[in-house]
Curated annotation (Swiss-Prot):
The keyword Transport does not apply. InterPro entries: Clx_II_MBL, Glyoxalase_II_hydrolase, HAGH_C, Hydroxyacylglutathione_Hdrlase, Metallo-B-lactamas, RibonucZ/Hydroxyglut_hydro. Zn(2+) 1 binds at residues 54, 56, 113, 140. This is Hydroxyacylglutathione hydrolase. It comes from Synechococcus sp. (strain CC9902). The gene is gloB. The keyword Metal-binding applies. Its cofactor is Zn(2+). It is an enzyme of class 3 (hydrolase). GO terms for molecular function: hydroxyacylglutathione hydrolase activity; metal ion binding. NCBIfam families: GSH_gloB (TIGR03413). SMART domains: Lactamase_B. Belongs to the metallo-beta-lactamase superfamily. Glyoxalase II family. Binds 2 Zn(2+) ions per subunit.
């Protein structure tokens, strides 16, 4: 039985990820419930679990309504965030491995955007489901072409988190929770106007977005080649980039 991955764009720029296998599904960071319920019902799916990468309202806002419709669904979130994600039914921490839909998910600590931010990693390690994975549900830590703002962590925290993502295989899909790619790459082209890989990717993403298509998922390899934050050699370099990006205003 093969898994499939689906992206639901919601609100202004959020992306809710749905992982389906057979007639069962897992949803990641549901900002709102209605589009998820519509998709599940249209495809005859049963919601088995909700994965929460961090506590921000635009990631957990749809969870209460989803649980009213699917009360048997697990809510998997960081144990360290149990007070801010109170509906969690399974607390996890760095290094934990959980099983959902017959697959293993690894939990990694990528705290920086928030103090208890986690990511969920699925390796390409299942002979019965060979085309699904590797991938990373990375929330707001790693974005296509960027990284999350440092609301509760430091540049050192973000540097460490991005190094953990960089250690994943290049083909790992980057399933982040916001469609910020075009603006991120526009900023990057201003910093490195002669970088052909960045400018080429920016033009590709601009074309996708002009048609209303998502640029996601990305890949770890693409981020290594074109994401200035992933290329930072020190936490100090990352801090300088983050400060510059925080004060940048797109035209």
């Amino acid at each position: 039985m093969h898994s499939t991955l689906h992206a639901l764009p919601v609100l202004q720029d959020n992306v809710i990820w749905i992982w389906a296998r057979g007639k069962n599904a897992v949803v990641v960071d549901p900002a709102v419930a209605e589009p998820v319920n519509q998709w599940l019902n249209a495809h005859g799916m049963c919601l088995r679990a909700i994965l929460q990468t961090h506590h921000h309202a635009d990631h957990i806002g749809g969870t209460p309504d989803l649980l009213r419709e699917w009360p048997q669904a697990e809510v998997v979130a960081a144990t360290a965030d149990r007070l801010r994600i109170p509906l969690q039914t399974r607390g996890v921490a760095d290094g934990d491995v959980i099983n959902l839909l017959g697959r293993r998910l690894e939990v990694i600590d990528v705290a920086a955007h928030t103090s208890a931010h986690i990511a969920f990693i699925i390796r390409n390690d299942d002979d019965q489901d060979p085309s699904f994975g590797p991938l990373a549900f990375c929330g707001d830590t790693l974005f296509a072409g960027g990284c999350g703002r440092l609301f509760e962590g430091s540049a050192q925290d973000m540097y460490r988190a991005l190094q953990r993502f960089a250690a994943l295989p290049d083909e790992t899909l980057v399933c982040c929770a916001h469609e910020y790619t075009e603006a991120n790459l526009r900023w990057a082209t201003e910093q490195r106007p002669n970088d052909v890989q960045i400018t080429t990717r920016h033009q590709t993403v601009k074309a996708l977005r002009s048609r209303g298509d998502l640029s996601l998922p990305s890949s770890i390899g693409a981020e290594k080649r074109t994401n200035l934050f992933m290329q930072a050699e020190t936490a100090e370099q990352l801090a300088e980039l983050r400060s510059h990006k925080d004060h940048w205003r797109s035209s």
